[in-house]
């Protein structure tokens, strides 16, 4: 349960050098925030691209801030695939969330078909470029590489596969944004990460 997870994260101990952020469904954001220490961030799993208006069912960054939520996950593969969110819409959402003072976990990643077709880098670069076209300050952005074929399938990208993509992304940032952003931006891997494989994945330099 959320209460049990919050208790574990509260009693820890957590590594002081590691920023911990918990992403939970919207109905439980307030509960999670109230039960976690301030040192643990809470992220919404989505938000919309404008502050207010006739968008029934959508949650704005302003609403999240009212709940004392500091983070939001945007561009998750399920939002792209199931709800048809385009690269452009996700970029607009990222830009607006940042402008409103939220920190963003921006998700990118390829499908199995795209990987088998040798399109992994092309897809990741396209998705990242859409965001880069709208975002100039990357200090509050974490890029999450989440290969679609490794989400909820039990399949995990090998540490070597994840590292290859992360290296390619850093080079893309060097070539298309700046060397400073490339060196400082956090890139994380997501996709069937478990207690059994997290140490090996985390050992990779990128």
Curated annotation (Swiss-Prot):
PROSITE patterns cross-referenced by the UniProt entry: TIM_1, TIM_2
EC number: 5.3.1.1
Catalysis: reaction(s): D-glyceraldehyde 3-phosphate = dihydroxyacetone phosphate
Major enzyme class: isomerase
Isomerase as UniProt keyword: yes
GO cellular component, one term: cytosol
Catalytic center residues: 76, 146
GO biological process: gluconeogenesis; glyceraldehyde-3-phosphate biosynthetic process; glycerol catabolic process; glycolytic process
Biological or metabolic pathway of the protein: Carbohydrate biosynthesis; gluconeogenesis; Carbohydrate degradation; glycolysis; D-glyceraldehyde 3-phosphate from glycerone phosphate: step 1/1
SUPFAM superfamilies noted in UniProt: Triosephosphate isomerase (TIM)
InterPro entries: Aldolase_TIM, TIM_sf, TrioseP_Isoase_bac/euk, Triosephosphate_isomerase, Triosephosphate_isomerase_AS
Record Pfam families: TIM (PF00121)
Gene3D superfamilies hit by this protein: Aldolase class I
An annotated Gene Ontology molecular function: triose-phosphate isomerase activity
Assigned keywords, A-Z: Gluconeogenesis, Glycolysis, Isomerase
Similarity annotation: Belongs to the triosephosphate isomerase family.
PANTHER family in the record: TRIOSEPHOSPHATE ISOMERASE
Self-association and partners: Homodimer.
Protein name listed in UniProt: Triosephosphate isomerase
Organism: Aedes togoi
Gene for this chain: Tpi
């Amino acid at each position: 349960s959320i209460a049990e997870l919050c208790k574990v994260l509260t009693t820890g101990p957590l590594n002081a050098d590691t920023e911990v952020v918990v992403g939970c469904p919207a109905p439980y954001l307030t509960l999670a925030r109230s039960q976690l220490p301030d040192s643990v961030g809470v992220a919404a799993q989505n938000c919309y691209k404008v502050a207010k208006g006739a968008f029934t069912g959508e949650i704005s960054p302003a609403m999240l801030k009212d709940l004392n939520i500091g983070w939001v996950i945007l561009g998750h593969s399920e939002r792209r695939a199931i709800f048809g969110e385009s690269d452009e819409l996700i970029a607009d959402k990222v830009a607006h969330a940042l402008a409103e003072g939220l920190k963003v976990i921006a998700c990118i990643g390829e499908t199995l078909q795209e990987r088998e077709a040798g399109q992994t880098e092309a897809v990741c670069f396209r998705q990242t470029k859409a965001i880069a076209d709208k975002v100039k300050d990357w200090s509050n952005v974490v890029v999450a590489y989440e290969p679609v074929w490794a989400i909820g399938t039990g399949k995990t990208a090998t540490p070597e596969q994840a590292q290859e993509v992360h290296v390619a992304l850093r080079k893309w940032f060097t070539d298309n944004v700046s060397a400073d952003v490339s060196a400082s931006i956090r890139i994380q891997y997501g996709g069937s990460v478990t207690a059994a494989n997290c140490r090996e994945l985390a050992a990779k330099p990128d």
